[in-house]
Amino acid sequence: KIFLIEFQKTSIDEPHIQELTPEIINSFSQKKEHTILLDRIGNANNLGAIVRSAAFFGIKNIVIPKDESQTSITTSSYRVAEGGMEFVQIYSTSSVLSLLKSVKGKMVRIGTDLNASKNVSVIHDLCTKKPALIILGNEENGISESVRANCDELVIIPFFGMKKGKASPVESLNVAQAATVILYELQKGNQAF
């Protein structure tokens, strides 16, 4: 027997990526909206998974740099987001450093770093008066040195049994997995139950 399988071509409209303006940046802090900044995330599936986690945890804003090392929204990232693209606005910026400088004092700029001394569990307490700008770095290199230098706080997700001088069985979590842990810690004090 021969079975014929017909594949239906489906097209997904690319979500509008809005250019970040000073007015939009000010609205993040005025509305006390936590925001995610991606620093050169190269994998479209990771972008989609981060969008899905952001939507799940009520984060409405994600900023991506206009940089060729930063992935944009693809059909793959849209599918991985599983509906999250409808709840999250993606913005683009031509300068990550300008964004970090413009939110100084208005938002808590929190970077992720394998050498950080603060546990991610403190993240909610860091953001009781100002919203967070969570910075997630490239899959291989993390956040850049210039971004790290412009963070108010650096946090680490500790591995099981973490002790000074003890190596992790794996270097780190995937950036999308790390985003989920960070957003959970950020929002855990805001649960309605």
Model-predicted regions and their roles:
Residues F3-S117:
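RNA substrate-binding interface of SAM-dependent RNA methyltransferases
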Residues S76-G84, E145-F193:
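Structured adenosyl-cofactor binding patch, chiefly the S-adenosyl-L-methionine
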Residues D39, N46, E139, D152, ...:
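Acidic active-site catalytic centers that drive phospho-/nucleotidyl reactions
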